[in-house]
């Protein structure tokens, strides 16, 4: 009887816990608001994993409740002593196979989604991707457009409906590049170039941020990704090429020093005089100051 009362007391708290949970849902989470094929594939993976794990939890709690009620102590079985057993082959097979099946059910779609994210989205394989080098520094982001021969700091413009091949690297501590509505994060590391493919299906503004703590200015490492129509994107590129100042080596050396800066736009990029794969690029400011 006491066990039954305790169970119903716990059950009565369920509506309250749901209210508390839903209270944090007044604003849609960016991760659950996919705006591109990569983000959509990862969103589907999250939903599948959540549903599968919810089903498992539901089955466990149902079995737990049934066993508690059915095999609880009663006046008529106070003297019952269960027989001694040394194993149950069927049960041992079940509780070995079930976890294996669960892991397989989670692993297959996860592996497929992971490998798919390393390539141009299949919906856009016929479109040439725009290449953009992403460089993290303390505490800002630099975006270099090699073909367009321009560079921006702390903001990023891309054409909508076109795959973007990001080349991720760093001139400071390891960081992580993340635009939640367009896809998952990936690390930026010294002396390495990591590829990341993302795409925005339609024009809009998307928040990007650092997903790896990198010191006191970490909270300032946010940037805006604005997806434009192809016509507006081409117009913006042309305006930058014609009106923005050149990014000199001295100016670049100043930008990558630890500190917080605002938005900047240049009609050239630092890749013309710094090789991202070189040792010097790993800590550009350190090597420049030694000379």
From Swiss-Prot:
Statement: the UniProt record of this protein carries the keyword Signal: yes
Leader sequence segment: 1-28
Tell me the PROSITE patterns matching this sequence: COX2_CUA, COX2_TM
Q: Which GO terms describe its biological process?
A: ATP synthesis coupled electron transport
**Organism encoding this protein:** Bacillus cereus (strain ATCC 14579 / DSM 31 / CCUG 7414 / JCM 2152 / NBRC 15305 / NCIMB 9373 / NCTC 2599 / NRRL B-3711)
Q: What subcellular locations does the record give?
A: Cell membrane
The keyword Hydrolase appears for this protein: no
Family, similarity comment: Belongs to the cytochrome c oxidase subunit 2 family.
Q: What is this protein called?
A: Quinol oxidase subunit 2
């Amino acid at each position: 009887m006491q066990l039954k009362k305790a169970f119903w007391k716990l059950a009565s708290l369920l509506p309250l816990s749901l209210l508390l949970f839903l209270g944090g849902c007044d604003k849609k989470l960016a991760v659950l608001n996919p705006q591109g094929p990569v983000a959509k594939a990862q969103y589907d993976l999250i939903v599948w994993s959540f549903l599968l794990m919810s089903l498992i939890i539901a089955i466990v709690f149902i079995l737990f409740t049934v066993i508690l009620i059915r095999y609880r102590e009663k006046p008529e079985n106070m003297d019952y002593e269960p027989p001694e057993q040394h194993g149950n082959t069927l049960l041992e097979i079940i509780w070995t196979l079930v976890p294996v099946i669960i892991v397989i059910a989670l692993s297959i779609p996860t592996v497929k989604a992971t490998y798919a994210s390393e390539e141009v989205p299949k919906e856009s394989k016929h479109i040439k991707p725009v290449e953009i080098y992403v460089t993290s520094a303390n505490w800002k982001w630099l975006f270099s457009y090699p073909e367009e021969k321009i560079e921006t700091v702390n903001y990023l413009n891309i054409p909508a409906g076109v795959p973007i091949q990001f080349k991720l690297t760093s001139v400071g501590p390891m960081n992580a590049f993340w635009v939640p509505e367009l896809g998952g994060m990936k690390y930026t590391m010294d002396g390495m170039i990591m590829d990341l493919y993302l795409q925005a299906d339609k024009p809009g503004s998307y928040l990007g941020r650092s997903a790896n703590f990198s010191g006191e200015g970490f909270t300032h490492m946010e940037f805006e990704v604005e997806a434009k129509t192809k016509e507006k994107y081409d117009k913006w590129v042309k305006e930058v090429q014609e009106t923005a100042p050149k990014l000199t080596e001295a100016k670049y050396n100043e930008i990558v020093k630890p500190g917080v800066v605002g938005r900047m736009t240049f009609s050239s990029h630092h890749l013309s005089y710094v090789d991202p794969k070189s040792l010097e690029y790993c800590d550009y400011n350190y090597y420049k100051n030694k000379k």
